[in-house]
């Protein structure tokens, strides 16, 4: 049985876009979630102990997340907790808990976002069904950036790290693609 959880927190770094030997895109990221509690004696809000949770995304979803998310962004992520056992170079056995992310996006509590549907493999923008009557359509800067990140990572240039559009301004576009649960590669 999988444990499905929802985590709200801030990204500690830009998502790391890489490719497996078979060519599948994969993104790793860490979400820091800090509980806040109200202290009635002092009349102030106090931070609790932060939780740092490592998350992973695959394929087109990984490419879209790398193009849309950046360090410091407040996100909400839903996924399954998975335990991973591994051995260090020194031969020590270790265990880690990771979040296999099913859904992730920026929270709208302190920001706004304009979303546009990405076409196959995160390239280009399909027509916006919610566009105004002028039929505004065009190339989304984040989608174009997604293509650059993908090419750089495939060529080993920056491996996608620090290659992201780091704007976290009100009204920024966020590109994403619907990801059916049958397509989740785990």
UniProtKB/Swiss-Prot annotation:
Alphabetized UniProt keyword annotations: DNA-binding
InterPro entries: NA-bd_OB-fold (IPR012340), Primosome_PriB/ssb (IPR000424), ssDNA-bd (IPR011344)
Alphabetical GO biological process terms: DNA replication
Tree of life domain: Bacteria
Biased composition (Acidic residues): 175-186
GO MF assignments: single-stranded DNA binding
Residue ranges annotated for the SSB domain, each copy included: 1-108
Chain spans, region Disordered: 119-186
NCBIfam families: PRK07772.1, ssb
Subunit-level organization: Homotetramer.
Protein name from the UniProt record: Single-stranded DNA-binding protein 1
Annotated source species: Tropheryma whipplei (strain Twist) (Whipple's bacillus)
Name of the gene this protein is made from: ssb1
């Amino acid at each position: 049985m999988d444990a499905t959880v929802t985590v709200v927190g801030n990204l500690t770094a830009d998502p790391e876009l890489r490719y497996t030997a078979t060519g599948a895109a994969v993104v790793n990221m860490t979400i820091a979630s800090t509980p806040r509690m109200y202290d009635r004696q002092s009349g102030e809000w106090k931070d609790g102990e932060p939780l740092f949770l490592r998350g992973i995304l695959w394929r087109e979803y990984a490419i879209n997340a790398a193009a849309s998310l950046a360090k410091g962004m407040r996100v909400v992520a839903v996924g399954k907790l998975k335990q991973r056992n591994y051995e260090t170079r020194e031969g020590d056995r270790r265990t880690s808990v990771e979040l296999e992310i099913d859904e992730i996006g920026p929270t709208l509590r302190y920001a706004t976002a304009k979303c546009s549907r990405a076409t196959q493999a995160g390239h280009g923008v399909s027509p916006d069904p919610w566009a105004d009557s002028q039929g505004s359509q065009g190339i989304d800067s984040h989608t174009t950036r997604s293509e650059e990140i993908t090419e750089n990572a495939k060529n080993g240039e920056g491996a996608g790290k620090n290659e992201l559009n780091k704007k976290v301004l009100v009204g920024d576009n966020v590109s994403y693609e619907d990801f059916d649960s049958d397509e989740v590669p785990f």
